[in-house]
Amino acid sequence: MNPNQKIITIGSICMTIGTISLILQIGNIISIWISHSIQTGSQNHTGICNQRIITYENNTWVNQTYVNISNTNVVAGKDTTSMILAGNSSLCPIRGWAIYSKDNSIRIGSKGDVFVIREPFISCSHLECRTFFLTQGALLNDKHSNGTVKDRSPYRALMSCPIGEAPSPYNSRFESVAWSASACHDGMGWLTIGISGPDDGAVAVLKYNGIITEIIKSWRKQILRTQESECVCVNGSCFTIMTDGPSDGPASYRIFKIEKGKITKSIELDAPNSHYEECSCYPDTGKVMCVCRDNWHGSNRPWVSFNQNLDYQIGYICSGVFGDNPRPKDGKGSCDPVNVDGADGVKGFSYRYGDGVWIGRTKSNSSRKGFEMIWDPNGWTDTDDNFLVKQDVVAMTDWSGYSGSFVQHPELTGLDCMRPCFWVELIRGRPREKTTIWTSGSSISFCGVNSDTVNWSWPDGAELPFTIDM
């Protein structure tokens, strides 16, 4: 074969290969177009097949939440339809309390990235329940956890995470800069209330779906503060209580009615002989009931009940089973403040059922240790100390702390009544445990059930001190 023939042969082979390659590319383009057309068309069909099954492997991010799972099928596309939470149902009948969540955040925080927190509380929408908490702008077992026994600082913030999870930078959502706070969902969006600033000029910042909608300035210039638990939403309006004034004497107490983050009405309570702080509130048949802390002179708990027009009634739980801490031994109660061991106090809650009341309280009379639920069938109106049911949830030897109420609406549970629930803060570190340089807490929660339950202890369980404390 002479050189010219070789050139012609090689050229022919190259042209043949090029032609085949071009045909393959055209076929590939046609195949992609047909596949895209089929996928686009299938998205227009409705029915049970439009649920997307996504397989997550190893570590990934889902809706800004870090997930560490393997080969797990998750059904995506949960219905997120907005609806107004009516709040018109009565409380569900219950016989006891079932454990609902436990986050073990202090135990996990000895080795993982977990926030230093206090004042956790829980609130539920019609889709989910979330744990809200006040961070100290620091992580456990880190140098910035030093001195976090302080209540009010510019580093504190209200954040939230899915219920039952240890609060960390990887699963938590920023809500508001705050050292006192509340939050609730009206069925359409989250209302958050965050109070921050100096003691003599603090400001409450109201946000609706993350956007600032209203400001409340301290009117007494004496540590404006709010509930440290969920506010209450009824028929599209949300309600909260704030306190401004002395913690050891008469102060000023205001109820606010809020719609989509905007204040539509407010009143000041006429309660010169009562003291209302850190109220735990819940809806019941369209009204709002709040059970609060008397830090001035009552070892029984004050209450205020009001309707959607803010017409209100006030009083004290009459039972001789006293709910505050410190408190005297159970005995003769009063429908007015019980002055014995009445100074100071701790955030708490109760649920009213007619003349009866479920009382949540520490097991210790003098320190924040242990926790129990007591059913007094006449305790709302009678002053004796007789009760029918006592359920232990934290042993006397283990630390507790604040506690508060939250409810699950029928729109979430599918029940025809309002499910009562509560949470308990399990404080660890200073000032009681002086081997640490920090103060933080984990939490547990329970919900009411109409069945037999169990006495047990669900303590924090962390072994102290940590490495940073050595």
UniProtKB/Swiss-Prot annotation:
Residues 36-90 are annotated as: Hypervariable stalk region. Gene3D superfamilies: 2.120.10.10. InterPro entries: Glyco_hydro_34 (IPR001860), Sialidase_Influenza_A/B (IPR033654), Sialidase_sf (IPR036278). Glycans are attached at residues 44, 58, 63, 68, 88, 146, 235, 365, 455. Its EC number is 3.2.1.18. Inhibited by the neuraminidase inhibitors zanamivir (Relenza) and oseltamivir (Tamiflu). These drugs interfere with the release of progeny virus from infected cells and are effective against all influenza strains. Resistance to neuraminidase inhibitors is quite rare. Residues 91-470 are annotated as: Head of neuraminidase. Catalyzes the removal of terminal sialic acid residues from viral and cellular glycoconjugates. Cleaves off the terminal sialic acids on the glycosylated HA during virus budding to facilitate virus release. Additionally helps virus spread through the circulation by further removing sialic acids from the cell surface. These cleavages prevent self-aggregation and ensure the efficient spread of the progeny virus from cell to cell. Otherwise, infection would be limited to one round of replication. The influenza A genome consist of 8 RNA segments. Genetic variation of hemagglutinin and/or neuraminidase genes results in the emergence of new influenza strains. The mechanism of variation can be the result of point mutations or the result of genetic reassortment between segments of two different strains. Intact N-terminus is essential for virion morphogenesis. Possesses two apical sorting signals, one in the ectodomain, which is likely to be a glycan, and the other in the transmembrane domain. The transmembrane domain also plays a role in lipid raft association. This is Neuraminidase. It comes from Influenza A virus (strain A/Malaysia:Malaya/302/1954 H1N1). The lineage of its organism: Viruses, Riboviria, Orthornavirae, Negarnaviricota, Polyploviricotina.
